[in-house]
Amino acid sequence: TMKEVIDKMNMTEITSVYGLTEASPGMTQTNAADTFEKKVNTVGTPFPNVEVKLIDPDTGEDITEVGKKGEIVCRGFNVMKGYYKNPEKTKEVIEDDGFLHSGDLATIDEDGYYSIVGRIKDMIIRGGENIYPREIEEFIYTIDGVQDVQVAGIPDEKYGEIVGAFIIKEEG
């Protein structure tokens, strides 16, 4: 974990950068002066001259509510012009207004710090309800004796998908 890296390697000024190859070198970053909690629980605030926002993945509407999940998108000098000789793929990820879709789900806090909470493609849709595997995994990790867990959608005739959890128990 980030705490272990900071403690064991005495890297007190470590920061986190979030971004994609398509938005190099990144979109957001924590700062060395940020609190420990901000460093380990968020991916920071936007780089200068880079616009970052959250949108509803279904409607494309902006999300400004603190703590509400949405797709993190950005535009700025860091965003690629497009995929080489692949305008169709480019059109899928870059809007006409220049915003690049990350495919990642995030929240924003009251201080403007973003936290990545999952991937859109990983989302399980059960009877019209959006379920985020990462939330379930984090809960299962709180159970004593769990070493690792992976949650995925399993096809279901009635609901479209149901939740499956694959758990590795700790030895002993």
Regions found by a protein language model. Give the residues of each.
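Gly/Ser/Thr-rich phosphate-binding loop
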Residues: 1-38, 51
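Glycine-centered tight turns that cap/initiate beta-strands
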Residues: 10, 49, 89, 145-148
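Conserved beta-loop-beta connector loops within the AMP-binding
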Residues: 53-73, 92, 110-111
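Short Gly/Pro-enriched turn/cap motifs at secondary-structure boundaries
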Residues: 41-46, 94-97
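AMP-binding/adenylate-forming catalytic core of the ANL superfamily
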Residues: 76, 81-82, 105-172
